[in-house]
Amino acid sequence: MLIVADENIPLLDAFFQGFGEIRRYPGRSLDAASVKDADILLVRSVTKVDRQLLEGSRVRFVGTCTIGTDHLDLDYFAQASISWSSAPGCNARGVVDYVLGSLLTLAELDGVALAERVYGVVGAGEVGGRLVRVLHGLGWKVLVCDPLRQAAEGGDYVSLETIVQQCDVISLHTPLQRGGEHPTWHLLGPAQLAQLRPGAWLVNASRGPVVDNIALRELLLDREDVHAVLDVWEGEPQVDLQLADLCTLASPHIAGYSLDGRQRGTAQIYQALCRFLGVDEQVQLADLLPRPALAQVELDASTDPAWALATLCRAVYDPRRDDADFRRSLSDDPQLQRAAFDQLRKHYPPRREIEGLAVRLRGESPQLAQLVSALGGALV
């Protein structure tokens, strides 16, 4: 059996060497010739997998180690009887950590209390749903927009217009859909952006085209009170340099790039392939994850909760490091800039998740205990 895989998928050998030969290629360079003789294709979001890539090949299973599937032509897969799997939720915690770190930075810049802001989460799937649970656990006011879940479940969902008009913070977590009943391409365009509240914060860690980047650039040129945090970009790895300069925080599509999340994505595709082949799993992710460099933090029960929140989040992740690295990589030469974008992702340093952090409290503090629980840490 021949497996063709994106070279940047972690733990390829550990999970897949027992199935046969593995050939690695840069994800953006995969073409029909590369996959012609493959039985299994393993990709990330940078590879468009469609008829043009697969027609005439032996591929019968496609696995993408990502949450999103907008790079997969699922209609063609159905026509060609090609099985597939994504990795839903694999990096959800990493994205939540990214958002929390960004909020802490913006709060310090504006001198505001996070607990006093109104949060709007657009898209309540694996990532957005987890973020909502964390924010609710912290006791913060959250409005949620998800028309698909609202139609299926009912509940206290609100419209996008309500989010834009009433929320101080908007965090986007939708898949990219260009058509259908609820398209998300340019979900936030000129009309929506013009309605942002004074001092609004906008975070996009979903897909670049969910926000009209040109319209956002024009808004930021006109309104210095608005903060934008962008991890995803229209046309990436090409980046609008002026827009990047106007963003308060900017990064190269790494919000979900925690070590745990990336390896969890590989593990989920391995499990799906085992089911497809009808074989038992022989490898477990828990046996492969290294011990975190920082495994435990100790807090006194008298610790200020706001300080504790910042300390715990930044003990695990601080987006300002990624922002600085990204800005240093930007270049007026489009070819150099695209290459730098991919290199930052390829050589991204190990980053763990807050759910792997143990917290010991000296004394009793129900408020701190609730904070740790909301973040997903473990009280010991």
From Swiss-Prot:
Keyword NAD: yes
Reaction(s) catalysed (UniProt annotation): 4-phospho-D-erythronate + NAD(+) = (R)-3-hydroxy-2-oxo-4-phosphooxybutanoate + NADH + H(+)
Enzymatic class: oxidoreductase
Compartments, record wording: Cytoplasm
Record: residues binding substrate: S45, T66, Y257
Cited InterPro entries: D-isomer_2_OHA_DH_cat_dom (IPR006139), D-isomer_DH_CS (IPR029753), D-isomer_DH_NAD-bd (IPR006140), Erythronate-4-P_DHase (IPR020921), Erythronate-4-P_DHase_dimer (IPR024531), NAD(P)-bd_dom_sf (IPR036291), PdxB_dimer_sf (IPR038251)
Amino-acid positions noted as binding NAD(+) in the UniProt annotation, renumbered to this chain: D146, T174, A205, S206, R207, D231, G256
One of the GO biological process terms: 'de novo' pyridoxal 5'-phosphate biosynthetic process
Catalytic residues as annotated in Swiss-Prot or TrEMBL: R207, E236, H253
Keywords: Cytoplasm, NAD, Oxidoreductase, Pyridoxine biosynthesis
One term under GO cellular component: cytosol
Pfam family, one: 2-Hacid_dh
EC number: 1.1.1.290
Subunit and interaction comment: Homodimer.
Similarity comment: family membership: Belongs to the D-isomer specific 2-hydroxyacid dehydrogenase family. PdxB subfamily.
PANTHER family: FORMATE DEHYDROGENASE 1
Cited function: Catalyzes the oxidation of erythronate-4-phosphate to 3-hydroxy-2-oxo-4-phosphonooxybutanoate.
Name the UniProt record assigns to this protein: Erythronate-4-phosphate dehydrogenase
